[in-house]
């Protein structure tokens, strides 16, 4: 058990953050319609691009070549409908990440600009994790995971976000990412995240340590079995 007596300031903040995060993990509101789709396919969804863009593309800089996938993920988060989100595709050495833009941190949550950063170049075995190399449904799932972070940030103050940043430097990160997966399931993207997690494990099935490290390390991301267990316990996925 961790002793508060010997905790560093960063450790204290991380502990407080984890406790707060457990209490504030967000799921789709009861009065909000949640859509669950077992599998999105490009051939079925491409005809809906214009209507999706009109409804969910407002204030969004969509990622080139992944516009449809991003819009499908955004359609599960009505809170983000008018929020400014920039999807950036660049060589950043991590498959995907999400955070508020530093220049907008002092604004109210809904008036901030949020970034979803997608890596464009990975080397060796990690190349399989590039978004372009993943199945369509899995692409929707991992983008949805990053947008689950964005929804969470809508309820975080400047100081809360600073604590979140410190969390990434400690074991608190494990709870942070797992809460993000749980939140995503509540918004109806469980199957998409399941397909993403399954893809990663198929690609690296010969090396379980590689799976852990490539997905963030230390069991930070839920396995397909864990995701399925939560879905099976939810009435949203009863059908």
Predicted regions and their residues:
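A metal-dependent hydrolase signature that marks the N-terminal structural subdomain at the beginning
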Residues: 26-107
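Long, well-structured alpha-helical subdomains associated
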Residues: 190-239
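Bacterial N-terminal signal peptides
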Residues: 12-22
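Short alpha-helix carrying the canonical HExxH Zn2+-binding catalytic motif
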Residues: 135-151
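Active-site scaffold of zinc-dependent metalloenzymes
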Residues: 97-136, 153
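Post-HEXXH active-site segment of zinc metalloproteases
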Residues: 152-181
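Bacterial N-terminal signal peptides that target proteins for export
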Residues: 2-13
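Catalytic Zn2+-binding segment of zinc metalloproteases
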Residues: 146-162, 186-191
């Amino acid at each position: 058990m961790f002793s508060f007596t010997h905790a560093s300031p960063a450790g204290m903040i991380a502990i407080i953050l984890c406790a707060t995060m457990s209490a504030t993990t967000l799921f789709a509101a009861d009065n909000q319609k949640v859509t669950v789709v077992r599998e999105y396919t490009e051939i079925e969804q491409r005809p809906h691009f214009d209507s999706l863009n009109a409804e969910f593309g407002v204030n969004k800089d969509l990622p080139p070549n992944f516009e449809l996938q991003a819009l499908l993920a955004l359609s599960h988060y009505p809170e983000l409908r008018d929020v400014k989100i920039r999807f950036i595709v660049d060589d950043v050495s991590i498959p995907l990440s999400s955070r508020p833009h530093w220049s907008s941190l002092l604004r109210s949550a809904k008036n901030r600009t949020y970034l979803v950063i997608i890596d464009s170049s990975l080397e060796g075995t990690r190349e399989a994790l590039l978004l372009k190399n993943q199945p369509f449904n899995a692409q929707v799932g991992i983008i949805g995971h990053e947008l689950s972070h964005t929804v969470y940030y809508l309820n975080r103050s400047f100081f809360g976000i600073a604590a979140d940043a410190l969390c990434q430097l400690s074991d608190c990160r494990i709870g942070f990412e797992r809460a993000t997966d749980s939140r995503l399931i509540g918004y109806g993207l469980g199957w998409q995240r399941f397909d993403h997690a399954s893809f990663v494990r198929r690609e690296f099935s010969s090396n379980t340590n590689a799976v852990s490290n490539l997905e963030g390390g230390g069991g930070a991301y839920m396995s397909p079995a864990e995701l399925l267990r939560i879905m099976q316990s939810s009435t949203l996925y009863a059908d």
